[in-house]
Amino acid sequence: MCGISACLNHTNNSAMTSVVNALTKLQNRGYDSAGICTTSNGKFNFVKSVSDDTNNAIHYIKNNPLANHHCSIAIGHTRWATHGEKTIENAHPHFDASGRFSLIHNGIIENYDQIKSMLVESQNYQFYGQTDTEVAVAYLSYLLSENKTWFDFNESLKGSWAIIALDKFNPEKLYFMRNGSPLIIGFNETNTKAMIVSELSGFDSDISQYCIVGDNDYGYITNNNDKYIIKSQQHYQMISMGKIVMDLTPSPYKHWTQREIYDQPNAIHSLITERIVDSQLFFPEFNTINFTLVEHIVLLGCGTSYHAAQIGRRYIREFRPNITVDVIDGADFEETDIPKSRNTLLILLSQSGETKDLYRALVIGKQHSLKTIGIINVENSLIAREVDTVLYLRAGRENAVASTKSFTNQVLMLFMLALKINLSLDNSQLDYYTMSLNNFPIEFKKIIDQSVNEIPKLLEFFDNQTSCFILGKFGLEWIAKEGSLKIKEISYVHSEGYSSAALKHGPFALLHQNIPVVLLANDDSYFSKIENANSEIRSRKAKVIFITNKLIDNHCTDYLIHINTKSPLFHLLCIVPLQLLAYHLALSKGINPDYPRNLAKVVTVE
């Protein structure tokens, strides 16, 4: 769950600049620590840094003189800690004892403990840190000293890896090796510049062609008559690079989280205008799927995507009731979850398209010949390339760890998918829903504007509070869980989301005087149940924040947010005040909401 970058550029010696810029764009993959390295005059020049409460590691790297060093070759790494604490010793790059190799790595070497024991016992090797990567570079050095090769190195590792290495004895070659973890090689138009990155967004704007390194491949990039070429075990056809426009700062907003919350109406508009054409739902991808044969759907997601999948389950069950639907956390999906005698469709939801647990589930599905659909935000990502059908979210890049606009577009995509395959709606009902969708960006913007004005009062309820509850019924239960996740993620306030009916079955014991409880309620047949919960909670002197589209007496609750809408997507509008509450709670505690502790946006380990 790390970001790696490397560059060869002999024309203007700006390799280090490219690497540092790439790391800035790859912070979504982790930011516990970071490091950069180059080689010259037979030695490595490097710097490492660790994130602290003041700044993240990339900030310290960018302010080090080495970040502006002129060189033709450089590598860089931003880390999410899996083996070993976030310390300078455990930060990448790592070096072997002889000082020959500098190596960076994304993934997990599963047999590193056995290799480490062998090196300690047979070579009396002294390790300075606790990472599997340090073991890998030590083992590489050992194998080559024993007249072994990179082939032997590749064959003897178990797990997943994307490795880049510098060799002091071959200072103009950039070595790479991949199995399971993503690795992409790109060139500029004249092949006078080469880059290796974890994802396409890490490339400089002048990279015009790329290839995705195949599993179990290894090799190097080298200079051949002033043009860089790939020498490896597999042959690659270069893919033309589309234009990637990526801002490096959240300007004019202070944080990416804030910008992405405010950008949701635009993201919604982009998705809806692609999927509703001439007032008709437009899914040409479904021409290859015969939904009349589909008997069962399994929706898979992790974290925020899991919450979106649960809401999508309700849509499909409502509009296509003859299809049964399960929602399973991608990390928990097993072969036994596939019905033996039913035609099953697998739908995978992932912002990044690289979620390791989901990719494992995809492999299982393909082994059982299931049809697969990916609902993905990042184009041409790992899962997007390997599913049978991909539906892109068109939410634009998310930089903040906490997902906002991708969640909104995931829910909308599932809503439109369910409408498209429906068996229960007539034309007038479909027209009503498509009209509601077309109006939704405007409604969403209104709720953002309204919620901003509510925030100062909401924050008062959280003064000196370390916990809160968010409750909803039916589809709003999963909005409650998503809002609760946002609060936990970026403000470090302990928050739990439940069905409003579940509170009295245990969690009620945690209520105490003044604890904030957010109630989400639609003006429907469940409203009276929410009113009962409101009374029960207030009788324990907890403070209730009521978010609803029904006009009620202000005296019935401690604080009322009335969302004036009859939209069938009211439940999705309820996420807005919760997202903004999480953001402003983080600010009130002096926390950078974009990069919460211990988290990474792209989860590429199991």
From Swiss-Prot:
GO MF assignments: carbohydrate derivative binding; glutamine-fructose-6-phosphate transaminase (isomerizing) activity
Metabolic or biological pathway, per its Swiss-Prot or TrEMBL entry: Nucleotide-sugar biosynthesis; UDP-N-acetyl-alpha-D-glucosamine biosynthesis; alpha-D-glucosamine 6-phosphate from D-fructose 6-phosphate: step 1/1
Keywords attached to this entry: Aminotransferase, Glutamine amidotransferase, Repeat, Transferase
Keyword Cell cycle: no
SUPFAM superfamilies the record matches: N-terminal nucleophile aminohydrolases (Ntn hydrolases) (SSF56235), SIS domain (SSF53697)
NCBIfam families for the chain: glmS, PRK00331.1
PANTHER family linked: GLUCOSAMINE--FRUCTOSE-6-PHOSPHATE AMINOTRANSFERASE, ISOMERIZING, GLUTAMINE--FRUCTOSE-6-PHOSPHATE TRANSAMINASE (ISOMERIZING)
Enzyme class: transferase
Catalytic residues, chain numbering: 2
Enzyme nomenclature, EC number: 2.6.1.16
The Glutamine amidotransferase type-2 domain, residue ranges: 2-224
Protein name: Probable glutamine--fructose-6-phosphate aminotransferase [isomerizing]
Organism: Acanthamoeba polyphaga mimivirus (APMV)
Function, as annotated: Controls the flux of glucose into the hexosamine pathway. Most likely involved in regulating the availability of precursors for glycosylation of proteins (Potential).
